[in-house]
Regions:
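C-terminal non-catalytic regions of proteins with extracellular/luminal or membrane-system context
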Residues: 2-4, 8-207
Length: 207
């Protein structure tokens, strides 16, 4: 347990499970020269994924997030900056706001939602989006790391649809408009819609 051999094995499994869905114009592999600025955007870049629930739970001694891995790989000669790009509400906010637009809501429910808890959260989302776009525009390389998290990639419930939560599609669209070579990395254990796929030059899928 936790031997060098085991660590190499799980690293190999993780690498082999990744799928390069798209790589136009040979955007990948990235060439981060000394002194360049790299923007890592998306909450999943800094999130811990191993502590799942139920049969998916792993008692990991440690986990290297994508953001940590990028910083470790590039070393001190490259400036790596991070922005979440979107806001993940706490459990109370999430219970009041339906990110996946369930059709059972009435017009009255929707109006109440948007004027009470939705307004403040939407302002935070727009601020996070603006921060991410500004960071992307000032960087040489842009990497978006998004997808699902344990609020949606769980056992015991069905997703209403296959849309990305937390307004991620809007964030990705804005990043691709600002920096067409933005690399999109998805972390998910189930399919998701990717309406921006035609615009993206590089898409990497990870489980």
């Amino acid at each position: 347990y936790n031997t060098e051999e085991h660590r190499r094995a799980v690293l190999d499994v993780a690498r082999e499970s990744m799928i390069l869905l798209k790589n136009e114009d040979q955007v990948l592999p990235l060439q981060a020269e000394s002194g360049c600025k790299v923007a890592v955007i998306g909450a999943n870049a800094a999130a811990i994924h191993s502590n799942g629930g139920g049969s998916a739970e792993i008692k990991a001694l440690y986990e290297i997030s994508p953001l940590m891995g990028i910083k470790k790989l590039l070393g001190g000669n490259v400036k790596v900056s991070y922005a979440p790009g979107y806001v993940i509400p706490d459990k109370k906010e999430a219970s009041e706001i339906n990110w996946q637009a369930a059709s059972t809501e009435t017009a009255e429910d929707t109006e109440k939602e948007s004027t009470v808890s939705g307004r403040a959260l939407d302002e935070k989302q727009q601020e996070a989006l603006a921060e991410a776009v500004a960071l992307a525009e000032s960087s040489d390389i842009v990497i978006f790391v998004g997808g699902l998290n344990h609020d949606f990639d769980v056992e015991g419930l069905d997703r209403v649809n296959m849309k990305l939560p937390y307004g991620q599609d809007e964030v990705i669209d804005a990043l691709l408009k600002a920096v067409p070579d933005t690399v999109v990395c998805m972390y998910a254990g189930a399919p998701v819609e990717m309406p921006w796929a035609e615009k993206a030059k590089a898409i990497l899928w990870s489980y």
